[in-house]
Every structure is written in structure tokens, then in C-alpha cells.
């Protein structure tokens, strides 16, 4: 019987190796209970990574399993659900047909998440587990490595800030499918695979430099296999292992042949084939950065789906903490391209004052506020490439960067707003201008118009305005800027840039200086 004031929620994950559902009754992030778990093995990864298509037989199998899941959802009285698909579906050329069949046969809507969003969802779950375990990054940082069937996410966290984040297409199943069977059985395979992995993750080594961390946090689908081989309880939420013990384990694994692995660890051949890629990948990752302790968590992608859903519904404190971590990542990206931090922070501060005054009336909420902050921080990073036409390079750099927590559409909005804060929208004479899809025009225009005004208020890059208030009355946005400095350049630039804001919002911006 459902508890009073509790909501029943189903999280469904269509992964590369497993189709899973978790049904939960929740009141908030502290008061919830998982009441049903279903896991059905499907081998999408092996088919998709090699042939880029999901066979018809698997499509039918997926739909049959989901029909069963729907019956369970009805029995439990599920009121809310989120269904997400990851790597295998994301890369399938027949993705559209799969999603259409799922919807027509089950009524379920599937959100296909991109890799940065996938890594972020896992990051949220792991972060929550480590906080419960009192694992802190205040003094000594941690490097989080999530390995899935099709990808690898590497995140460096120090002082509760994301200092580095990178994602790579080298998951365990993908590695296995990258080499034909006769190559995997070659006596040269170990060396070739080691060199392949080393060259692939080389950029991470360069980015991390001489960084040191206390904790190396491992998660992902293959950690269950690792725990089994280490003789540890797979059901336990967190395992802590000394780095030296981990290295010793890998040394022993590297010496074993496939038949020996099957015999010693009682593994099926198809599972034993994954051991060597797993061991060699972990070994390469361990060499990236010295760590004193290895932490292995049992958190799955589906746990992240659940936590994000419940947190967004019930926990504003958690939402704020997660937002601040994303802001730290935006600044990390800005610093990589030698941005002017003081200018970025000033533009962000002034933009938010304007945004908070007009957001509700113009259909903007918390998510648009986050995208605005990202735009303010990153709008000038193109100057790292070239001072002339820097906005096109800002657009290209943002589009080329993985930003966990932002979807591809979110990232495109930030990139476009960064470009159009300095360029005219719908300028047909500008052949280099990135195209804006029709449905994105309103949000891109609104964010770009706000950043354009705020940028004008710091045109000198000298942060002359130390405080600012905004009033909105009779379609006039009055900006009262407090400063003891000469604001002539800012006033002139504000007047030049205000036309676009007026076109977008139907509000006339007026700047008044206040001597304070």
C-alpha cells in the first residue's frame, strides 16, 4: 500500500548491455524507498558499436520487455516516469525507428541522452554516495572515472569544484569490438591494446599535469566484474582499497591467459574476454595521476536518473549545490582559454540582475538562468584563438567542448548566445554566422540581448560599476549603475547595444549613473 504524501516514480534505462527499471516511492531525497528492480540483459552494444544498427530482432525484444515493465508500472500505480537511453541507442543509425516502435507499442517516450549528460547523471549519483561516506575533496582532490560499455568519463574534483572533465569513446565493449577475434587472440594483442589505450587517453595526461589526488573513484558496468575477481561483496555500496593492493592485483591479471582466467575465476568465455581490456584500461588510468586510495562505488546510471528526478522535485539545496559545481566547470573551461575572469564575473553579475527582473514575465526559468551564466562566463573565450572575429571562435570552442550537465541543445544555445551577443541576428550578409534553428531563436535572442547589455556595462573591462539596481515600469527598464568612475564609454556602448534588447523584449533600456 502506497504511503501517504509519497509519490511513485519509475526510472527506466535502455543501456548497451541491460534494460533496467527501478520503481521508487519518494517524499524527498532523504525519504525514499526502492520497491522494485528489474534487469533484463540485451546485447545492444555488440551489435551497434560494430554495425551502427540495432537488429530488428532486438527491437522486438526491447518492446516486449517494456510491455512487461508497463504492466508492473500499472500494478504499482506509478505516477511519474523517466526513460533514458544511452550509448548504443545514441549511436544507432536506426534510432528514430526504434524510438517510434517503442512509443507506438508501449506509449513510453524515450530521452536519448548524449555522453556528457550520461556522465553527469552518474556523477550526481556517485557524488551523493561519497558525501554520505564523508569523502571530502576540500584538502585533497579526487579523480572520478566512470567506464561504461561504450565510453569513459574522467572528472577531477578539488575543493568541491570541477577542475577537469573529459569524455572518451573507449568503453569496454567498444574496445573489444574494435579488434577482430583473431587479433584479440594474437600474442601481440596485450602490447597493441596498451599502446592503443595510452594514445587515446594521452590528452588527459597532458591536462592533469602534475596534479595529485587522495582518491581515485571507479564506477561503471565492469566494476561488478572487478569486485567479483577481487573477492569482494558486489552488493556492498562502497569499497575502499589501497592503491598498492590494486596494482598488485593488476600485475597478477596481466600474466594470465584467457583459459587461465576462465578456470581460476570460473568465468564464462564471453565475460573473460572483457577482463584484459578492463585490466589494461584501469592500469592506464591508474598511471594518469598518483592516488593513495581506490574507491569503487556500485552507483548505476539508473540511480542518477532517480536522484536527479527526486532532487529537482524536492531538494532546492541539492539543486543549488549541483549548479555551483557546474559553474565551477564553466570557469575551468574559461581558464583553459585564458579568459578575463573579472570581466566574465562582472558580466555574469550584471546579467543576472537584469534577468531576475524580467525572467518571469518573459517565460524564462532556472534552466535559462543557468544557460545565461554559462554564456556570460564563456562569451569571450574565442579571443584565445583570434582577437578579430573572436565571437565565431567562441562559438566553435564551446561547440567542441564536452560540458557535463548540459545537453547538446543546451550547449548549442550557449554557443549561439555567445556569438550573437556581438553580432546581428538574421544578418544575411554574414556568411560565417552559425544558423539558429527556428525553435531556438527566442531563447538564443533573449540570452544574447541580456549579455549584450551587461557586456556594454563593462565595456572598459575595468569593472567600474560596483553595484546596480534595475526597475521595470511602463515598458522601460531603468538600470541604475553606482560608480565613482567615468562611465562615458559604458554609456555610449549601452546606447548602441540597447536596440537589440528593445527588439527582443519590447522594453526600452535606460542607463542612469548614480554617484556612490
What is the meaning of each model-derived region?
Residues 2-35, 132-165, 220-221:
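Gly/Thr-rich phosphate-binding beta-strand-loop-beta motif of the actin/hexokinase/Hsp70
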Residues 5, 15-18, 75-78, 104, ...:
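Short flexible coil/turn linkers enriched for glycine and charged/polar residues
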Residues 83, 112, 296, 511-513:
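A structural preference for short, hydrophobic beta-strand core positions in alpha/beta folds
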Residues 92-99, 491, 495:
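Short, surface-exposed alpha-helical segments at coil->helix boundaries
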Amino acid at each position: 500500500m502506497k504511503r501517504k504524501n509519497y509519490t511513485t516514480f519509475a526510472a527506466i534505462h535502455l543501456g548497451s548491455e541491460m534494460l533496467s527499471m527501478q520503481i521508487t516511492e519518494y517524499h524527498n531525497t532523504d525519504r525514499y524507498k526502492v520497491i522494485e528492480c528489474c534487469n533484463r540483459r540485451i546485447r545492444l552494444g555488440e551489435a551497434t558499436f560494430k554495425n551502427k544498427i540495432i537488429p530488428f530482432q532486438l527491437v522486438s525484444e526491447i518492446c516486449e520487455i517494456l510491455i512487461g515493465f508497463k504492466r508492473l508500472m500499472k500494478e504499482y500505480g506509478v505516477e511519474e516516469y523517466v526513460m533514458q537511453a544511452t550509448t548504443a541507442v545514441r549511436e544507432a543509425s536506426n534510432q528514430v525507428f526504434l524510438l517510434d516502435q517503442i512509443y507506438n507499442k508501449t506509449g513510453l517516450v524515450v530521452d536519448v541522452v548524449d555522453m556528457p549528460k550520461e556522465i553527469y547523471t552518474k556523477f550526481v549519483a556517485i557524488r551523493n554516495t561519497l558525501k554520505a561516506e564523508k569523502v571530502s575533496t576540500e584538502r585533497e582532490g579526487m579523480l572520478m572515472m566512470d567506464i561504461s560499455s561504450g565510453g569513459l568519463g574522467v572528472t577531477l574534483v578539488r575543493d568541491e569544484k570541477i577542475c577537469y572533465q573529459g569524455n572518451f569513446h573507449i568503453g569496454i565493449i567498444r574496445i573489444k569490438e574494435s579488434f577482430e577475434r583473431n587479433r584479440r587472440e594474437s600474442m601481440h594483442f596485450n602490447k597493441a591494446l596498451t599502446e592503443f589505450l595510452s594514445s587515446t587517453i594521452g590528452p588527459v595526461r597532458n591536462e592533469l599535469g602534475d596534479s595529485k589526488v587522495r582518491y581515485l573513484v571507479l564506477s561503471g558496468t565492469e566494476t561488478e566484474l572487478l569486485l567479483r575477481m577481487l573477492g569482494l561483496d558486489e552488493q556492498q555500496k562502497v569499497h575502499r582499497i589501497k592503491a598498492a593492493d590494486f596494482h598488485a592485483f593488476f600485475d597478477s591479471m596481466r600474466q594470465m591467459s584467457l583459459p587461465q582466467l576462465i578456470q581460476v575465476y570460473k568465468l564464462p568465455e564471453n565475460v573473460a574476454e572483457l577482463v584484459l581490456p578492463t585490466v589494461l584500461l584501469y592500469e592506464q588510468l591508474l598511471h594518469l595521476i598518483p592516488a593513495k586510495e581506490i574507491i569503487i562505488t556500485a552507483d548505476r546510471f539508473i540511480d542518477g536518473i532517480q536522484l536527479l528526478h527526486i532532487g529537482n522535485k524536492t531538494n532546492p539545496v541539492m539543486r543549488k549545490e549541483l549548479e555551483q559545481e557546474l559553474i565551477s566547470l564553466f570557469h575551468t573551461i574559461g581558464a583553459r582559454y585564458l579568459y578575463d575572469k573579472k570581466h566574465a564575473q562582472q558580466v555574469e553579475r550584471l546579467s543576472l540582475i537584469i534577468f531576475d527582473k524580467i525572467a518571469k514575465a518573459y517565460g524564462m526559468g532556472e534552466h535559462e538562468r543557468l544557460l545565461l551564466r554559462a554564456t556570460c562566463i564563456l562569451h569571450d573565450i574565442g579571443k584565445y584563438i583570434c582577437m578579430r572575429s573572436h565571437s565565431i571562435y567562441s562559438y566553435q570552442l564551446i561547440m567542441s567542448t564536452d560540458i557535463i550537465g548540459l545537453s547538446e541543445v543546451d550547449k548549442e544555445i550557449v554557443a549561439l548566445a555567445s556569438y550573437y551577443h556581438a553580432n546581428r541576428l538574421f544578418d544575411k550578409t554574414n556568411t560565417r554566422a552559425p544558423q539558429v534553428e527556428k525553435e531556438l531563436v527566442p531563447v538564443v535572442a533573449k540570452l544574447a540581448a541580456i549579455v549584450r547589455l551587461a557586456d556594454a556595462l563593462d565595456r572598459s573591462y575595468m569593472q567600474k560599476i560596483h553595484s546596480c539596481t534595475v526597475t521595470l515600469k511602463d515598458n522601460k527598464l531603468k538600470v541604475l549603475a553606482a560608480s565613482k568612475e567615468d562611465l562615458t564609454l559604458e554609456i555610449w556602448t549601452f546606447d548602441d547595444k540597447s536596440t537589440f534588447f528593445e527588439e527582443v523584449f519590447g522594453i526600452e533600456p535606460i542607463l542612469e549613473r548614480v554617484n556612490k
